[in-house]
């Protein structure tokens, strides 16, 4: 199996970026919802938030297989792709699976 380390590293950096901007994003959301400020100011703050933090959103993060780096057919319970989980289940290496039975 080929491990896609560069893609895994990119996903790790995206998660770190999200964690860094999470506090700023929450502060801006609170400022936008604050009814004491003028509506124009709230909208301006919201536009700043949207324009600067596009790359750090939670939806930009993709779950990847920890062995192969594959994104498609990802099984969340095992953190593996379908192919890797199938091989490990056949060998009996997965928890709570005696044999490949699915």
Swiss-Prot record:
Gene3D superfamilies named among the record's database cross-references:
1.10.287.1480
| InterPro entries according to UniProt | Ribosomal_uS14, Ribosomal_uS14_CS
Subcellular localization(s) per the UniProt record: Mitochondrion
* Name of a matching Pfam family: Ribosomal_S14
Signal sequence, start to end: none
Q: Name one GO cellular component term.
A: ribonucleoprotein complex
Keyword set, alphabetical order: Mitochondrion, Ribonucleoprotein, Ribosomal protein
| One example GO MF annotation | structural constituent of ribosome
Determine if Glycoprotein is one of this entry's keywords. no
For this entry, list what GO says about its biological process.
translation
Record family assignment: Belongs to the universal ribosomal protein uS14 family.
- The name under which this protein is listed is Small ribosomal subunit protein uS14m
Phylogenetic lineage = Eukaryota, Sar, Alveolata, Ciliophora, Intramacronucleata
């Amino acid at each position: 199996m080929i491990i896609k380390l560069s893609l895994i590293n990119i996903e790790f950096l995206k998660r770190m970026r999200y964690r860094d901007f999470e506090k700023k994003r929450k502060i801006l959301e609170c400022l936008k919802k604050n009814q004491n400020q003028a509506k124009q100011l709230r909208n301006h703050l919201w536009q700043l938030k949207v324009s600067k933090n596009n790359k750090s959103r939670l939806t930009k993060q993709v779950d990847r297989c920890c062995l192969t780096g594959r994104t498609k057919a990802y099984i969340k319970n095992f953190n593996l792709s379908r192919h890797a989980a199938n091989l490990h289940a056949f060998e009996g290496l997965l928890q709570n699976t005696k044999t490949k039975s699915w």
